[in-house]
Structures are given as C-alpha cells and as structure tokens.
Amino acid sequence: MVDQEKETTHFGFRTVAKEQKEGMVAEVFHSVAAKYDLMNDLMSFGVHRIWKRFTIDCSGVRRGQRVLDLAGGTGDLTAKFSRLVGEQGEVVLADINESMLRMGREKLRDKGIVGNVSYVQANAEALPFPDNYFDCITISFGLRNVTEKEKALRSMFRVLKPGGRLLVLEFSKPLLEPLSKAYDAYSFHILPKIGELVAQDSESYRYLAESIRMHPDQETLKSMMMDAGFENVTYSNLTGGIVALHRGFKF
C-alpha cells in the first residue's frame, strides 16, 4: 500500500500514476492555451490582475536583476518584470507546456517586449539552470499542477541566489465557511459551463477546479517551503484566502 502511494498522485480528484500526470496536465493546457487570458478575466472577474500586481509589488525586483517567471504561461508577470529589470537585467519565462509558452512569446513580442526576455520550456522539478542563478523566482497559478511539488521547490531553491526570494501565487483555502461554500458552488457548477461556452471545453475547467481543492492549504505549503530550505516564509491571504501569496528567502 505504501509503495502504491509513492507511485500515484492526484489529477484533480482522480488518483493516477505519477508518470501519467504530466501528460494529462499537458493536454489540459494545450486545450486552454488559446483562450487562457480571456478565461482568466472571465473566471476571476479581472481580479487576477490585482493578485499579480500585488505579487510584483512584493517581489523587490530591481534594475539589472535576473528573474525566473516559472509556469509563466502567457507572460503577464514577465511583461511587468521586463520593465523593472531594464536593459541590463534578464527575465526568463519558463513553462513546461509548449502551447502556453508559444502564446506567451507571441503576446509579449506583439507588445514589443524583446531584448531582455528569453523563453525556456522547462519542468519545475528539474530546472535547467545553474546553481545560485536568479535573484527572484515567481510561480503563479502553476505549483498545483506540478506532480512532485517538494522536488520542484528544492529545484527552485537550488537555482535561487543567496539573498534571493521565491514568491508562490496560488489558489488556496478560503478563510470563512460561507465564502468556501459559495466558491465551491461557483467552481464546480458555473466555471465548467463558462469553459464550455467560451472555450468549448468544460472538462479542462472541471480539472482546474478540482486541482485547486487538492492543493495544500496555506500552512501546509508554508511547511513545504521551509522543508525545501527556504527561510522567513510568510504568506498573505488575498480575497479572503481564495488565493495566497507565499514568500520565502534563500540565505
């Protein structure tokens, strides 16, 4: 039984073999990539932009620094970081999903954001970067889709410079029971219908809702970050705990 648990993981509410999850998640994001930005605005009523703005404000990123926007998708954070680091800095937009990475590259180039941004297809569990390389790493709404989160956190710790910080922006556990019930009703009954109407894909958005429920809560993720080596780990609850921003440092 213990051996079986070591070889399985969650895909939404389903239990699947670990080697299957990466491909299953890939199919979800191949499917949603083209409508990803539109669906983000619809699903969150545009509030995701405020959550991301808060993340940027907490990053402490300065001119000349090197930033990794991990699971960066369509590049919302990368666009902001590109301006902050300036010509002497560098932003790496990394994503495991080719379709999402392509959408991000096309969107940023259309905006004229070139020169200090590079694009890398990478698995968070085995980042292809040198030790002590980045001043700041962000992973926004991506960690819950990673098969082995502890391994990914250790990989992020390795490539972060001493003195650098990791910011994890992710859906979490609402603080109040009435909010939690309303959020569940929205996520499981309304969200898949929006996905069907706008993206002709209810199943992918049902998975996204389920993956949120299976993600570690605020205190559990804090402990996971500390176990990976991060220090001074704190978190801020946003929108009543629907989302949390975790921050940790490497010293």
Swiss-Prot record:
Task: Please indicate if the UniProt record lists Lyase as a keyword.
Answer: no
Concerning InterPro entries, the annotation shows: SAM-dependent_MTases_sf (IPR029063), UbiE/COQ5_MeTrFase (IPR004033), UbiE/COQ5_MeTrFase_CS (IPR023576)
Question: What is any one GO biological process for this UniProt entry?
Answer: aerobic respiration
What UniProt keywords are attached to this protein's entry? Menaquinone biosynthesis, Methyltransferase, S-adenosyl-L-methionine, Transferase, Ubiquinone biosynthesis
Whether Translocase counts among this entry's keywords is no
Task of the protein: Methyltransferase required for the conversion of demethylmenaquinol (DMKH2) to menaquinol (MKH2) and the conversion of 2-polyprenyl-6-methoxy-1,4-benzoquinol (DDMQH2) to 2-polyprenyl-3-methyl-6-methoxy-1,4-benzoquinol (DMQH2).
Q: Which HAMAP family match?
A: MenG_UbiE_methyltr (MF_01813)
UniProt protein name? Ubiquinone/menaquinone biosynthesis C-methyltransferase UbiE
Organism of this sequence: Yersinia enterocolitica serotype O:8 / biotype 1B (strain NCTC 13174 / 8081)
